[in-house]
Amino acid sequence: MEIKGRFDHFNFNVLGFEKSIRVYEKALGLKEVRRKTASDGSFILVYMGDGETSFTLELTWLRDRKEPYDLGEGEYHLCLRVPGDYDKVRAFHKEMGCVCYENTDMGLYFICDPDGYWIEILPL
């Protein structure tokens, strides 16, 4: 049996989903493509997409969660390739104050979202 799957989405749990949405819109150009709210208001799922692929980033907000999430020591991250002038994009992210790691020898950097998740930025 050959399974021909494709990636659909990746999830980040967030404390302040409106703030997170604004960061993903401004820093990465993602747009909200879908939202699901529990009938009892206990959670909200917001799916952010790039408009080019069907892959989405699912932001999950849990009403009763008050303390920051423990992201552990796992070195997992998302990576986004950006078109255009890479140096200009990096300067924009530095101006936003969201660059959390930079390795100029390797030609890459990471930004952090409001909950501490890392997103690698590479040229297209």
Language model features with spans:
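Short, charged/polar surface micro-motifs in flexible loops or helix N-caps
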Residues: G51-F55, D64-K66, D85-D87
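N-terminal beta-strand motif that seeds the catalytic metal site of vicinal oxygen chelate
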Residues: M1-I21, E75-L78
